[in-house]
Amino acid sequence: MENQKQYPMTQEGFEKLERELEELKTVKRPEVVEKIKVARSFGDLSENSEYDAAKDEQGFIEQDIQRIEHMLRNALIIEDTGDNNVVKIGKTVTFVELPGDEEESYQIVGSAESDAFNGKISNESPMAKALIGKGLDDEVRVPLPNGGEMNVKIVNIQ
């Protein structure tokens, strides 16, 4: 049997995916079925753009359902051990870019729940990879997309 990729995530991320799946199954799926039904009532399906659009939407919804079900089946829930000495998935890390004193904070989460606009970065991102395993007051070199790097100092882990 082939090893399935595991999806590390927080309990909060797991529950969010469960809610998203429920919405897809109980709201979005029935809505698109109704759209298909209405579009069929227009007659000839060969040139029925409403029907084609609804079928496309149905395909996307079914893909999303399968993707989320797969991630939930293979989820690896990251438990908070209470250890705030080392950066790991689930922890919120505060650091300052050196030289400087302006603080930035990010929670490191699994890729399935990353949302940079809300301060959640994927454990697979260059920033998270550089920070994971490091400790309080450590100075860390973080690779940048342009090939450069920035130096940061970890000032808080929670």
From Swiss-Prot:
The keyword Transcription belongs to this UniProt entry's keyword annotation: yes
One GO BP annotation of this record: regulation of DNA-templated transcription elongation
Coiled coil: 4-70
GO molecular function, one term: RNA polymerase binding
Entry keywords, A to Z: Coiled coil, DNA-binding, Transcription, Transcription regulation
One Pfam family in the UniProt entry: GreA_GreB
UniProt xrefs under HAMAP family: GreA_GreB (MF_00105)
The protein's role, per its UniProt record: Necessary for efficient RNA polymerase transcription elongation past template-encoded arresting sites. The arresting sites in DNA have the property of trapping a certain fraction of elongating RNA polymerases that pass through, resulting in locked ternary complexes. Cleavage of the nascent transcript by cleavage factors such as GreA or GreB allows the resumption of elongation from the new 3'terminus. GreA releases sequences of 2 to 3 nucleotides.
Family: Belongs to the GreA/GreB family.
Name this protein carries in UniProt: Transcription elongation factor GreA
Taxonomic placement: Bacteria, Bacillati, Bacillota, Bacilli, Bacillales
Gene: greA
